[in-house]
């Protein structure tokens, strides 16, 4: 066994022993989040943006909007696409190059939470049905990895969307010309989905795992809900299994914590 494996085993034993005593390595209770800070409109040239700090984790989310064609099977809907960049300076485990499986999973979970909750009214992004729609790009940049990138990124994405303003557009049906006006309107956001992530370590389940907890967790579960209680995304990670009663417990906590975080997001964007 290598020195690194020995240290990981010692850390796991220490964390599990603390959990048996009802404690976490950073002093939080099992259902406590780390300190959460949200700032919006932090990228001047983006249509919307947000910076999120969750404990030692930092993410920056920018929103860009372009005009383009709709998907052939959804001619009366605008388009949303989510991309994630794991900045190499954020973690020794991040490498430059194309997105790896972690970045792809992160982008998919964030995208699914927004898309399946119908957070953005895609019908209102249509300029000409079947021909011209707004294409919204959600770009997530992980600046510092201190654990629980899923929640930090999802919170940053919805905060950035809520801060987004789009230039009004005039379309001339006779000439087919498009005029971009110097007038702006808010992106139509109808729901505020919030992801809540749990780590299973031994027989204990904790919310918002730190990086130390992620390194020793047996399983991970992320549940995204909106203000109506609708579940828009769920993602399981790692090999460990969750019992049905553990999933139901996680759902109950996800709804409660989602409401608490949602209030902070709305306050940050001036909609509280």
Curated annotation (Swiss-Prot):
<protein>
    <recommendedName>
        <fullName>Exosome complex component Rrp42</fullName>
    </recommendedName>
</protein>
<dbReference type="InterPro" id="IPR050590">
    <property type="entry name" value="Exosome_comp_Rrp42_subfam"/>
</dbReference>
<comment type="similarity">
    <text>Belongs to the RNase PH family. Rrp42 subfamily.</text>
</comment>
<dbReference type="InterPro" id="IPR027408">
    <property type="entry name" value="PNPase/RNase_PH_dom_sf"/>
</dbReference>
<dbReference type="InterPro" id="IPR020568">
    <property type="entry name" value="Ribosomal_Su5_D2-typ_SF"/>
</dbReference>
<dbReference type="InterPro" id="IPR015847">
    <property type="entry name" value="ExoRNase_PH_dom2"/>
</dbReference>
<keyword id="KW-0271">Exosome</keyword>
<dbReference type="GO" id="GO:0016075">
    <property type="term" value="P:rRNA catabolic process"/>
</dbReference>
<dbReference type="Pfam" id="PF03725">
    <property type="entry name" value="RNase_PH_C"/>
</dbReference>
<dbReference type="InterPro" id="IPR036345">
    <property type="entry name" value="ExoRNase_PH_dom2_sf"/>
</dbReference>
<comment type="function">
    <text>Non-catalytic component of the exosome, which is a complex involved in RNA degradation. Contributes to the structuring of the Rrp41 active site.</text>
</comment>
<dbReference type="Pfam" id="PF01138">
    <property type="entry name" value="RNase_PH"/>
</dbReference>
<dbReference type="InterPro" id="IPR001247">
    <property type="entry name" value="ExoRNase_PH_dom1"/>
</dbReference>
<dbReference type="InterPro" id="IPR020869">
    <property type="entry name" value="Rrp42_archaea"/>
</dbReference>
<dbReference type="GO" id="GO:0000177">
    <property type="term" value="C:cytoplasmic exosome (RNase complex)"/>
</dbReference>
<keyword id="KW-0963">Cytoplasm</keyword>
<comment type="subunit">
    <text>Component of the archaeal exosome complex. Forms a hexameric ring-like arrangement composed of 3 Rrp41-Rrp42 heterodimers. The hexameric ring associates with a trimer of Rrp4 and/or Csl4 subunits.</text>
</comment>
<dbReference type="GO" id="GO:0035925">
    <property type="term" value="F:mRNA 3'-UTR AU-rich region binding"/>
</dbReference>
């Amino acid at each position: 066994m290598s020195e690194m494996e020995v240290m990981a085993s010692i850390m796991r034993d220490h964390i599990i022993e603390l959990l048996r005593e009802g404690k976490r390595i950073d002093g939080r209770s099992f259902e406590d989040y780390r300190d959460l800070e949200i700032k919006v409109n932090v990228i001047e040239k983006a249509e919307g943006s947000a910076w999120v700090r969750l404990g030692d984790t930092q993410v920056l989310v920018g929103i860009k909007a372009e005009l383009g064609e709709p998907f052939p099977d959804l001619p009366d809907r605008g388009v949303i696409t989510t991309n994630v960049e794991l900045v190499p300076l954020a973690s020794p485990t991040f490498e430059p190059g194309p997105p790896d499986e972690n970045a792809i999973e992160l982008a998919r979970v964030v995208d699914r939470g927004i898309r399946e909750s119908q957070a953005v009214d895609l019908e209102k992004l249509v300029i000409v049905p079947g021909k011209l729609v707004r294409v919204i790009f959600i770009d997530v940049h992980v600046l510092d990895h201190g654990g629980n990138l899923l929640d930090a990124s999802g919170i940053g994405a919805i905060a950035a969307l809520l801060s987004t303003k789009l230039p009004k557009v005039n379309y001339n049906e006779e000439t087919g010309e498009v005029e971009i006006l110097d007038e702006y309107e808010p992106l139509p956001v109808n729901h505020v989905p919030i992801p809540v992530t749990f780590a299973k370590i031994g027989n204990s389940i904790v919310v918002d795992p730190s990086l130390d907890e992620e390194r020793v967790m047996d399983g991970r579960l992320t549940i995204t809900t909106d203000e109506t209680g609708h579940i828009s995304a769920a993602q399981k990670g790692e090999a460990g299994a969750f019992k049905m009663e553990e999933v139901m417990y996680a759902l109950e906590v996800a709804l409660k914590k989602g409401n608490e975080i949602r209030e902070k997001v709305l306050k940050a964007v001036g909609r509280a």
